[in-house]
């Protein structure tokens, strides 16, 4: 299935695995990427050298694109930002903060930057800052969320932006993917029970 997202990231399926803290490590990220989606390592509050190790371990398991989720409120965020640039990951997703101070560094290394946003205002700011796409995350999602539901947030962000929009929040199967397409998204980010049950997680 080809969409604007698959073409942007060089993947086969328009599905990004969410960067679940302490669950999304190298084994899960590699498995998702090998299956055709975009696997994500969740950096969470981990030290930068742990993230570096996870990136290198993922590269041993896949030659497909994968990414790192950088939680910007982490005290290690500046060091992690440098590590992902040095290690040459394909994609960075960001949450819990403003990635603008790292955008130039990542873009200079050819890294696609996809911030997670919970409002139209933040989505527009990220587009102006140079984001390649955004994840519009409804309040059904976990992590650092806003007040809008996925159903209301995604079409508003789609209408406001000229870059790809990925839907997140309450999406767990093909019906959710189809609904996201109807809302105007070009793909989804999932943190579903399907992933949580996988033997590649740390659970």
Model regions and ranges:
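Flexible glycine-rich beta->alpha loop in the catalytic core of nucleotide-sugar glycosyltransferases
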Residues: 139-140, 186, 193
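Conserved small/polar residues in nucleotide/adenosyl-binding loops
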Residues: 194-201
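Glycine-rich adenosine-cofactor-binding loop
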Residues: 167-171
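Active-site-proximal beta-strands of protease catalytic cores
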Residues: 134, 184, 188-189
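A generic structured-segment signal
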Residues: 163-166, 176
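Catalytic cores of alpha/beta
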Residues: 121-129, 172-186
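Catalytic nucleophile loop
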Residues: 32, 166, 180, 191
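Active-site entrance/lid segments in N-terminal catalytic domains of soluble metabolic enzymes
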Residues: 1-160, 164
